[in-house]
Amino acid sequence: MTETVNSARATARFVRVSPMKARRVIDLVRGKSVEDALAILKYAPQAASEDVAKVVASAAANAENNFGLDPRTLVISEAYADEGPTMRRFRPRAQGRAFHIRKRSSHITVVVESQKGSAQ
C-alpha cells in the first residue's frame, strides 16, 4: 500500500506578534499559490508579514524536499494563527499605580497542497 502525499506543513511557534495581527496577514494569502503569496507578503506593510512569509517558504521547502512535490504547483490550503503564551509586564504610572501590559505571542501554521492543474 503506497500512499501519495500531496501536502506539507510548517509551524512557527512562539512568534512575538499578536494572533489578531497575524490573522490579518494570513487572510491575505489563504488559498493563493505559494509564488503569489510570497510576492504579496514581500510588499505587505504589516510587521507580521515577514514571519508569515518565513512559514510559507518553509512549508514549500518541506513539500519539495520531504515529499518531492513541485513548488510551482503548491497552493496554501490551510493557514491559521493560534494564540501562544502571553507575557505579562507592568508599566509604572503616576502615584504608585501600575498598568498591565500583555505581550502576546502566536503559533503560525501553514499547510500547502499540490494542485496538479495550477502549473503554468
UniProtKB/Swiss-Prot annotation:
GO cellular component, one term: cytosolic large ribosomal subunit
Gene designation per UniProt: rplV
InterPro entries named in the record: Ribosomal_uL22, Ribosomal_uL22_bac/chlpt-type, Ribosomal_uL22_bac/org-type, Ribosomal_uL22_CS, Ribosomal_uL22_sf
Pfam families (UniProt xref): Ribosomal_L22
Organism: Corynebacterium urealyticum (strain ATCC 43042 / DSM 7109)
BP-aspect Gene Ontology terms: translation
UniProt record similarity statement: Belongs to the universal ribosomal protein uL22 family.
Quaternary context: Part of the 50S ribosomal subunit.
Function: This protein binds specifically to 23S rRNA; its binding is stimulated by other ribosomal proteins, e.g. L4, L17, and L20. It is important during the early stages of 50S assembly. It makes multiple contacts with different domains of the 23S rRNA in the assembled 50S subunit and ribosome. The globular domain of the protein is located near the polypeptide exit tunnel on the outside of the subunit, while an extended beta-hairpin is found that lines the wall of the exit tunnel in the center of the 70S ribosome.
Record bears the keyword Transcription regulation: no
Record's keyword annotation contains Cytoplasm: no
Single annotated GO MF: structural constituent of ribosome
The name this protein goes by in its record: Large ribosomal subunit protein uL22
Keyword terms: Ribonucleoprotein, Ribosomal protein, RNA-binding, rRNA-binding
